[in-house]
Amino acid sequence: MKPWERFLEKYAAFGMAPSVERYVDLFDVDATLLHPGMKSPIGRDQVAQFIERALKRLPAFRFIPIHWNFRGDTIFVEARNSAEVNGKPIAWPSIYRIVLREDRVLHGRAFYDRTEVLAQFDPSRASSGVNAHSRLLDGAVPGGASGSDRDISAELHDRFVKPYAENWKKPDPDRFADFYRPQARMINPGFERPLGTAELPQYYRLLIADTPGLSLRLERWAGSPSLLFCEWTATGQMGGRPKTLSLVDRFTLDGFQAVEGVAYFDRLELLAMADPAAARIGDVSDSSAALPR
């Protein structure tokens, strides 16, 4: 068994029966961890406190890896998370990007939208409409996963990753549709419904108009014939000031084109760029966290 496979086995075991001890054991002595809402990464000495608070605040928490890919020293894991709040079951999707040292986490970062989770502690803050993104892994079964030592990296890079990343350096809205199959769909956090391929050019025109100077820089990626993860740093102007946002895209592929593209980022981080009150909201383990009124 390869180191990343040993890690994934332990990660999945934690998800089935979460405990502070099992979680801490996933981390290297030099590890760092960053979740949405954290001001900066925490070290291994703070990991136990984080997960203890999170498990207390989110009873019956479970974590099921659905899709994954490994490349170099990095594994991406897309997972369905579930818990209970005041006796009510909740679920939300996430992507965890993990740089490994052997079979332990050296640098871990979580990508998900805190909005729906934190709104469970204050129902008046829930989304007014349907959030299609929050339910996208409902009913998903582990095994559509890809573990990715198959050597298609060069062709995948040349036919999809490189040209897609190049288009984000100076975005051409019409070009984005070329990376999708005609009947594909794209989902971002907060979308009430998926967008079809034909709708993508107009969506990106509006996004670029609202965010002057918008561009994305590729940080890491891992892929296989049917699955691709890309981590990005987005930069652009909001309110006349430069802003940055980290995010991950997951693409389901068919012949080097996407049949589904899903973005993972934190909408509260976007809100905090315009609303100082939102910047004070903590991570999901923070019992003082509340959405701004």
Please annotate each region the language model reported.
Residues R6, A13, V20-D73, P173-S226:
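A solvent-exposed, acidic/Ser-Thr-rich amphipathic alpha-helical stretch
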Residues L8-Y11, F27, I51, A79-N81, ...:
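Hydrophobic alpha-helical core bundles mediating ligand binding, dimerization, or RNAP-core interactions
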Residues L55-I152, R205-R293:
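A beta-strand edge to alpha-helix "cap/lid" segment located at domain peripheries
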